[in-house]
Curated annotation (Swiss-Prot):
Its main location: membrane. Pfam families: SBP_bac_3, SLT. Residues 270-518 are annotated as: LT domain. The N-terminal domain does not have lytic activity and probably modulates enzymatic activity. The C-terminal domain is the catalytic active domain. This is Membrane-bound lytic murein transglycosylase F. The lineage of its organism: Bacteria, Pseudomonadati, Pseudomonadota, Gammaproteobacteria, Enterobacterales. It comes from Escherichia coli O6:H1 (strain CFT073 / ATCC 700928 / UPEC).
Amino acid sequence: MKKLKINYLFIGILALLLAVALWPSIPWFGKADNRIAAIQARGELRVSTIHTPLTYNEINGKPFGLDYELAKQFADYLGVKLKVTVRQNISQLFDDLDNGNADLLAAGLVYNSERVKNYQPGPTYYSVSQQLVYKVGQYRPRTLGNLTAEQLTVAPGHVVVNDLQTLKDTKFPELSWKVDDKKGSVELMEDVIEGKLDYTIADSVAISLFQRVHPELAVALDITDEQPVTWFSPLDGDNTLSAALLDFFNEMNEDGTLARIEEKYLGHGDDFDYVDTRTFLRAVDAVLPQLKPLFEKYAEEIDWRLLAAIAYQESHWDAQATSPTGVRGMMMLTKNTAQSLGITDRTDAEQSISGGVRYLQDMMSKVPESVPENERIWFALAAYNMGYAHMLDARALTTKTKGNPDSWADVKQRLPLLSQKPYYSKLTYGYARGHEAYAYVENIRKYQISLVGYLQEKEKQATEAAMQLAQDYPAVSPTELGKEKFPFLSFLSQSSSNYLTHSPSLLFSRKGSEEKQN
């Protein structure tokens, strides 16, 4: 029996060695027999997108954006790296799918019947409507009926082209438009505010973000109803990628991650106020340059631009501001709070900013550790505005009403209830002006978006002006000038020192295509 056992062992080992030796010659060895297997064998998920404030951009060299963040998490879910290719317009995105250069398109693309004939849609995650925009002060059309190709231009591959054709066939036979093959929707909106173009069409979310920096852009009319936004992948008999996407989004929905990401990028609201935004941006030009050094000096755990947005919400950057309730100064501190922080003069801008930051940091340190890092600031700001105890009540109420107390998206919805007796009467700390705290945080977020985008727009303009100057005044030798070389760098520094940042633009478009490895 012992000998027989040894023979079987020998045969087994021999068979195993033979199988290993022959394995590479088997026809299906190494072949990725489905799309997910191919992605995992390659070790990277190839995603094509476009530069917009919402989908994909960079600040301080770091990529961010709703679609980028979701794509990065999906790549992690698959256990591979993310490779991002940035294209100029929507047509180029679908070319990537057609040519096998992308696994997915993640670019805020609208689901529609024409696209799904040729491409596989994924789960939908938010919705937009298509809107016609014009420049404030120019003629506002009330209908599409009389628009011509000389007035209306849209981006290539834009989903609205199908809607325009339907409207032309059924309602407005005189309607015509032009497609600019070289520009995306953001660039066309820039052309509108610069007076180069009368009208263009973009989605409602893109317009809302653009208006934070360019309040002179206005909506003339809606072209479509709300349309779901989705990702697209190749359409064939292989459904493994679609199944993985469905599982991924279901998991994100169940654990609240999707809601948190959407709150981060879409939670600023759409109640755009032209006058308020214009007033704020004028203050950025006129007042901020004097205060910027103080914001940069005392902002520690937060971005100085967020601190500036907080101060504007508090006092409109007025160091002498006083409210009927007795709060005073740049950061509108109460007398008791100022005394506890060692502030001797609340109307001294530096003391007020320094004290306000320390008070905010104290609120930040009290926010429960279970709150995600990138949402802690919003809980702290709510506490800064209405008191830490009432913020705890808001969290408790969120739990009682089956929400997530660690999700700002859930908690902020309950804030207005703190001033309603059926709710505050059952809470530990009673009545609070929760609706004011809600508006307070939302306004700060809007001012921050406007400030970041506007300063970076200034950087773009300064760079373009410098490049134009270099073209207009080409380099010559000191001998030819009879003096020192033209102080080009000095000019750039002086003309833009109040605005230059070390980050690429948030709200202006990029040309060409780029690839990023993450």
